From Swiss-Prot:
UniProt gene name: rpl32
Location(s) in or outside the cell: Plastid, Chloroplast
Family: Belongs to the bacterial ribosomal protein bL32 family.
Molecular function GO labels: structural constituent of ribosome
Organismal lineage: Eukaryota, Viridiplantae, Chlorophyta, Mamiellophyceae, Mamiellales
Protein's recorded name: Large ribosomal subunit protein bL32c
Length: 72
């Protein structure tokens, strides 16, 4: 198994850690940007499937107004 000859300096360890953190931050920013563009549905680079349309419009409005109509 490979074993390092000398102890790695704190400066070198810090540089490597900073590189890893920077790459993680860049990936997180990219993912957030991609998520934001998907939620706005304004970008042209993605395919947005059409929303399913219910044939019976009463299914979507179930429960609304029934209690209010009964009280009157």
């Amino acid at each position: 198994m490979a074993v390092p000859k000398r102890r790695q300096s704190n400066a070198q360890s810090g540089m490597r850690a900073a590189t890893w953190k920077r790459k993680a931050l860049d990936a997180a920013r990219n993912a957030l940007s991609l998520g934001k563009s998907l939620t706005t549905r304004k970008s042209t680079g993605f395919y947005y499937p059409p929303a399913p349309v219910s044939e019976n419009w009463d299914d979507e409005a179930k429960g609304f107004g029934k209690d209010l109509d009964a009280a009157e």
